[in-house]
Amino acid sequence: MMNVPIENGTFPHVIMGEFDANAGISQKKQPTKDPLLKGAAGHGCGHNLFGTASLGAAVAIKNLIASGKLKGTVKFYGTPAEEKFFGKLWMARAGLFDDLDACVDWHPAD
């Protein structure tokens, strides 16, 4: 998990950067859908987009805060195990969501 706060106000907002490392899928190590074995089970529902697009959004907000065009606090949380549903549970138990005003997460389509 990564917590990189950019502060210029109160009430933190978090952008979640989902990532997974699922074993046993038929997908070459690249950002586009390309199976190891044609027709084999794989996973390509946009997981290659989670981390990079979310980090890009956090950087854009950081730049607005730094320029004085926006007040607030933004944090970026690298979020593990989205596919298995327990990553956010670990984060909640660690108290990472306790002081937030809002938390943004999303899921692209395949």
Per-segment meaning from a language model:
Residues N22, D34-G42, N48, S67-D110:
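Histidine/acidic-residue-rich, glycine-tolerant segments that coordinate divalent metal ions
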Residues M1-H43, N48, T52-G72:
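Acidic/His- and Gly-rich active-site-bordering loop/insert found
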